[in-house]
Structure formats: C-alpha cells, structure tokens
Amino acid sequence: EAIKLEPDFIEAHSNLGITLQALIRLEEAIIIYKDAIIINSYYPEVHYNLGNTLKELGQLEEAGISYKHAIALKHNYYEAYSNLGITLQDLGRLEEAEINYKQALTIDPDYATAHNNLGLALQELGRLEEAETSYKHAIRLNPNSPDALMNLSIVQDYLNNLDIAIIQLKNLLIIDPDNYGLRAAVIIAIYSFLENDFSTSKKYLLQSSKIENYLTLNFKNERIYHQYLLKILDWHENKPFPLLNKISDRKLYVIGESHALVSHGLHVKFLDKSFLCKSMLIQGCMQWHLGNSIKNKFKVKFENIIKSISNQSDVLLSIGEIDCRLDNGIIKHRKKFPKKNMMHLITNTIENYLNYVYKINSYYKHKIIIQGVPSPNIETKNISKHKILELINLIRDFNIILKNKSTELGFGFLDIYKITNRGDGFSNEIWHLDNIHLSPQGMLEAWKNYSSY
C-alpha cells in the first residue's frame, strides 16, 4: 500500500523485500530489492538484503557482488563482511573468506557469528588449532550457541581430542535437545561404540530416534550413521558368543570413513595370526582428501591417528567408497570437467592417495592393508542406463588400479569387490548391511579370502 501511494518510497520497498524473503518468496523479494536499488542505489541495507536473498537461492557470485556494494556504501558493515565471507567460503575461496571474517571482527570483535564462521574457514584450511580458538571465542560471547558448540566438538574430533569433543556434545544434549542434541547423541553413540561400550551406544541411538524424522541436509550425515550403527549393534547382539573377550589377539587398526565402523570388534584371522579389529573413524574422508597437495582437516586427523598407534602396527585403511559414488567424488568432478579422462582421474586419485600414505608411513613402518570398494548396491529404477554403466565401470576400474598400485608399494589388499560382485558389477546382496556398507559378516567373509601383505 505504501508503495502504491509513494512509488519512490525506498523504505517501503526494502520492508516488502524483507517480508517476501521471510515468506520464502525469494524471487519476488529479489525483484523488489532491485526496484529499490533503481530508486536509490545508495541504500546499503538493500544491497545487503539482496545479497542474503541471492545467497539463499545459491546465486553466490551475484550475492558476493551485492555484499561488496553494501560494504562500499557502509565501510563498517561488519554483517556484510561476514556474509561475504560465507559466500566466498561456499565458493571454495577460503583464504578470501578468512580475510572478510577478520575484517568483520576488526570492526566488531564481539560478533560471535563471525568468530564461528572464521572457525569454519580455518577448519577447512586444516588450521585446526586456530579454528578451535575461534570457536571458543564464539562460545565465550554466546555460551549457548549450538552452532559453535557443535563446530568445536567437530574440530576436537579432527584433533583426536575425543574426550573434549564429548564434553561439548553432552552440553548440546542439554542446550538444544531436539535439534543439535539429536546429532550430538548419534555422535556420542559412535564414540561409545568405538570404546566397546555397546550398551551406552545403543542407549544414545534410541535417545536420538527422532532424528529419522529430520530430513533436511543438516541431519543427513547423522541420520545415516544412526541407521547404520543400529544395524551393526543388532548384528553383535544376535551373535551367540561375545566378540570382544579375546584380549590376547593382536590389534588390527581399521582407519577410515564410515566403512571402517563395521569392522570394529571383529576377530579376524589371516597369515596364521588372530587379530581384534579396532576402528578409528575419519568421517567423510575420501582418497582425494588425503592425496590432495593442500593441507586439510582429514590429513590432520589421519596423521594424528597414525602417530597415536605403536610403530609397526597392523593397519587396514578403509577409504575410497565415497570417491566412487554417483553424487560425489570422481563422477561429480568429471561432471564439472567433462573433458577429463575417467581413467586418468581414477589413476591420479589412487596414486596420490597411496603415495601420501606411503610417505607418511615411512617413519612408522605400519603394515598397511588397503581395503577395496564394494560393488554398488543401489536402486536403479530412476537412474539412466548411462549413469549406471558409468558407475559400474568406475568401481570395477577403481578396484583393479587400487589393487595393482597397492601391491606395487608393498601394501596388502583386501578385496571387497570380489565377494560382493554378482558377475555384472552389481552387488549380490549377500554381504551388504544397507545400500552402502558391508555387514560385519561380509567383512569376515572378505578376510577368509585374504592371503598376504
């Protein structure tokens, strides 16, 4: 109504844009903000709000331009600096993001959100101690910030300070029980499982059962772990004998992403020796992360774990399945760069990963076994034949090259693909626990076929 009476009333345009944005009518909000800028391009808040709306729509480059316009008009606009930092971080421009977060904090050192966001950028850059400091600043300014508490727990995990991580997670159970607390409960369940406290693990999984109803992206990771770990625990509960009592067995450290969890607590035998598997988790770790020349959080945790175990230990590395998914890793990268050769991408990923492991292990002399990637166990109904063939060929070739390169470097190779392949590259559905992971029984079966380092 105000706009009808006075079409050049910029505050009315701005307020209408904010209202439309709150109603998730983002395209309409953008039109209104742009109309306002035509009326008066010197109104920094309109540029800022336009940037926020564009960011919500994923139009990151355009959002960045709007934030820069806002900052040019209002040099002390610390919120715009912080949001520009978020946009740059989402674009993968982490060093630029860091600069903008720090500029926001120069203007307002008590801006807790910028401390938290700076921590996220530093974490992705592999500067974990600095990230820890930033999160602690954010928590000091806002002790009940679930974002900062969760992020601090995550960085403590990558630093391998699991006891400290658990303290932050337990705080989240109290502060935000129906949101971040659900995610925290799942993570505590994982830690409890890895400490062989299966009953406590089950308790926290049951406590967080509502997470199955949370379908947003923020909960996806913990929701998958919730389902997966429940199935692992059910398998252990249904075994007729306790698997964790043979303390005389030599330890086999299983280091990796979610696929490492299923081995924990299993007794395996190879080369006439018995081993008790102890899993050590690096959530979301890909071969690409470790083979990358740039320092990152995954490398920091991997190296912390490798250093934490006795020299010349037996180690199984369970990393690589995430590199071989339809929506991630090599296929996702090739979609972005379609001219790149698939075999070159596979070989490059594997060689960089294995060379990194070989170099890091040169001092510790661990006896390394590389775990292969299972045949895919996916629903193909809504996937094109081209995509299915691409995935099948990728996983087949990935395993062949991974095995050959592992052998060249003197590593053992645990062939998961062989026992899961029904003959055409798809899973035989015998050894999978879910659509992604093998069952504990599947891992035991794989070890029956293992012959040497």
Regions found by a protein language model. Give the residues of each.
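Residue-level recognition of tetratricopeptide repeat
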Residues: 9, 43, 77, 111, ...
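Conserved alpha-helical positions within TPR/SEL1-like repeat arrays
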Residues: 11-22, 45-56, 79-90, 113-124, ...
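Conserved SGNH/GDSL esterase-like catalytic core that processes O-acyl groups on lipids
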Residues: 252-352
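Active-site segments of SGNH/GDSL-like serine hydrolases
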Residues: 320-323, 357-392
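Extracellular serine-dependent O-acyl
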Residues: 366-374, 396-430, 449-453
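Substrate-gating cap/lid alpha-helix
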Residues: 378-416, 436, 441
